Design a protein with these regions (language model features):
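Glycine-rich phosphate-binding loop of actin/hexokinase-like ATP-binding domains
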Residues: 99-150
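ATP-binding/phosphotransfer module of carbohydrate and carboxylate kinases, centering on a glycine-rich
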Residues: 1-48, 95-100, 144-301
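Active-site nucleophile and cofactor-binding loops and adjacent substrate-binding regions
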Residues: 82-90, 105-106, 133, 264-274
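Short beta-strand-loop/turn "lid" adjacent to the catalytic site in phosphate-handling enzymes
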Residues: 25-26, 42-84, 93-96
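Conserved strand-to-helix beginnings and helix N-cap segments that scaffold or border functional pockets
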Residues: 34, 63-67, 136, 249-250
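Glycine/charged-rich beta-loop-alpha catalytic/anionic-binding loops adjacent to active sites
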Residues: 73-81, 120-127, 255-264
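Small-residue-enriched, tightly packed secondary-structure blocks
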Residues: 88-95, 108-112
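Glycine-rich beta-strand-to-loop/alpha-helix junction loops that act as flexible
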Residues: 53-59, 106-109, 234-244
Length: 301
């Protein structure tokens, strides 16, 4: 039996023996990936598995030593093998099923992975402080920042302020304004920013357009990084929470098409859980830096 986990910034999902368990417990700001998984595993039903496939945010494109992950999965589930996977690779495999192209995953953060005849490239995934441009944290932080400023009389965009009414109240309720709860508030505010843009807020539209342009740059850099050219026709899938907003996706696609005119935009065939499951069953060797395996040594008597 195989345990499949998809750990993101805004939540996590696990699949054991066909049963899926969704949680709003994700990787907290400043928390190690192993500590995040331990907190999630404590809430999962007791099970025995042979293999664990862990698709995780927080690696920034370089998967760390898999041995602590093997020890953790062995402790909770008796796992003998573990595949530790950058969430971008899991998203790529799940969405395109091996086709040449780029998968842009937008959650609280941003990760873009391309595959071009077995050459892989990874872009962004740099974390919310210095990267993840155009992602949920980025959108929500900018939107809530401007809403708070407008409330103080620094600007006048009542459409934005109205769209962020609940988020402003949530900010006021924060005991610490720059801790993990504040980061989570920024991520959950992304949908308010996009809704405000849809409602005609000039401030929100400007933020949305900038985010779309930055994400297009990320996609193009990812394709070129895998040895592609601007004359190619890669498949491009855009997935994740903010991608549920059609106007944001359209803006991203329009920006991509200006540089990659033959790009083919496709719907994702599957998600990170599907990708991690496929990797566990088909990619049995390391594909560093995005995939590393660890196997428990056989006991001798």
């Amino acid at each position: 039996m195989t345990l499949i986990v998809d750990l993101g910034q805004s939540g996590s999902r696990a699949r054991i023996d066909g049963q899926q368990i969704d949680s709003d417990r994700g990787k907290l700001n400043g928390e190690s990936v192993v500590d995040s998984l331990r907190a999630i595993f404590q809430k999962l039903p007791e099970s025995q598995v042979d293999i664990a496939a862990l698709a995780c945010t927080g690696f920034n494109g370089v998967v760390s030593d898999p041995q602590p992950f093997l020890a953790l999965c062995s402790e909770f589930f008796g796992a003998k093998k573990v595949a530790v996977i950058d969430d971008g690779l899991a998203g790529f495999v799940g969405a395109l099923g091996g086709s040449n192209g780029v998968v842009l995953s937008i959650g609280g953060g941003v990760v873009s992975v391309s595959g071009n005849n077995s050459h892989f490239a990874h872009r962004d995934g740099l974390g919310s402080t210095f990267g993840d441009e155009g992602g949920g944290f980025w959108l929500g932080k900018l939107g809530l920042t401007r809403a708070l400023g407008i409330r103080q009389g620094r600007g006048d965009d009542q459409v934005l302020l109205s769209a962020f009414e609940d988020q402003v109240s949530a900010f006021d309720a924060l005991k610490v304004k720059n801790a993990a709860e504040a980061s989570t508030l920024a991520i959950t505010s992304a949908k308010n920013l996009l809704a405000a843009a849809d409602a005609g807020s000039p401030t929100a539209i400007a933020i949305r357009n900038e985010g779309a342009a930055l994400l297009a740059q990320t996609v193009i850099a990812t394709w070129l990084g895998a040895g592609g050219s601007l004359d190619d026709a890669p498949e491009i899938a855009i997935q994740g929470g903010p991608s549920k907003n059609p106007n944001y996706v359209s803006a991203i696609q329009a920006n991509i098409s200006r540089s990659l005119p033959y790009a083919k935009f496709v719907a994702a065939r599957g998600d990170n859980l599907d990708g991690a499951f496929w990797i566990a069953n088909n990619m049995h060797k390391d594909a560093e830096p995005l995939l590393r395996w660890a196997t428990k040594a056989a006991q001798t008597h």
